[in-house]
């Protein structure tokens, strides 16, 4: 089975503030989500994973790519066409 992934570019530079804002929006607007422990890479990059009934949501604060972005198996209309 192929799972569609929605990608949302939030910030063109890595940013703890933008990363925290995205996580806050997801946590406040999504119902019945489970937050996993945050993953931190050796370069300081962070990944926050959320589980929902419809699929996973992954929020990245990626210092190697230098961006904040979301890859999600769930369509997140709150991020379509806008950035934080």
Tell me the role of every PLM-derived stretch.
Residues 25-27, 36, 43, 50, ...:
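General N-terminal targeting signals
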Residues 1-3, 14, 45, 58, ...:
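Alpha-helical structural elements
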Residues 8-11, 48-52, 70:
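Short beta-strand element of the conserved SAM-dependent methyltransferase core
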Residues 53-84:
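Short, compact, well-ordered microdomains
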Residues 1-39:
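Negatively charged, low-complexity tracts enriched in Asp/Glu with abundant Ser/Thr
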Residues 40-60:
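Short, intrinsically disordered low-complexity segments
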């Amino acid at each position: 089975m192929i799972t569609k992934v929605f990608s949302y570019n939030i910030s063109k530079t890595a940013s703890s503030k933008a990363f925290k804002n995205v996580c806050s929006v997801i946590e406040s607007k999504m119902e019945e989500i489970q937050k996993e422990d945050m993953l931190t890479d050796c370069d300081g990059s962070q990944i926050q994973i959320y589980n929902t009934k419809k699929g996973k949501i992954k929020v990245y604060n990626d210092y190697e790519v230098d961006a904040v972005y979301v890859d999600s198996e769930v369509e997140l209309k709150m991020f379509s066409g806008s950035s934080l």
